Amino acid sequence: AFAMGIGPEAVAAGLGAFEPVPGRGTRFVGKHLVVIDEAYNANPDSVRAAMNVLAGEAGPRTFILGDMGEIGDSAEEAHREAGEYARSLGIDALYACGPLSRHAAEAFGEGGRWFETRDALIEALKGLRGTATVKASHFMGFAAVVRALQDNEE
């Protein structure tokens, strides 16, 4: 920006006006829960990045994971590694929904829970407190999970 003659004030104003796109890291701060919405897309790298962010947040910290799509033959292993990685970061709980995400919940161990349906997951999240990240590939429809968490806080 500076090379193009844009001054620091204009850069600061532009950055200050930035609003994240829903599903791409937006935050909702409720009375008892902070929701980090990462529900638009998921792959192994972006899941680890989202877990790294959550690990630095106030607890209890819950990672809500839906299936990662389009990752080929390594899908089960990638989900299992996600659960192991979340555990290694000290994340308090991992809630999962989707046939592949079941491997993440199992690998997470104690505090890992798997739900067969999105509705069952949403029901289990009622009363959740602390900080929660919602991460899934778009086809999982986890924007509904984000909305439910927000509605529970209003």
Where are these regions (language model features)?
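ATP-dependent carboxylate-amine ligase
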Residues: 1-154
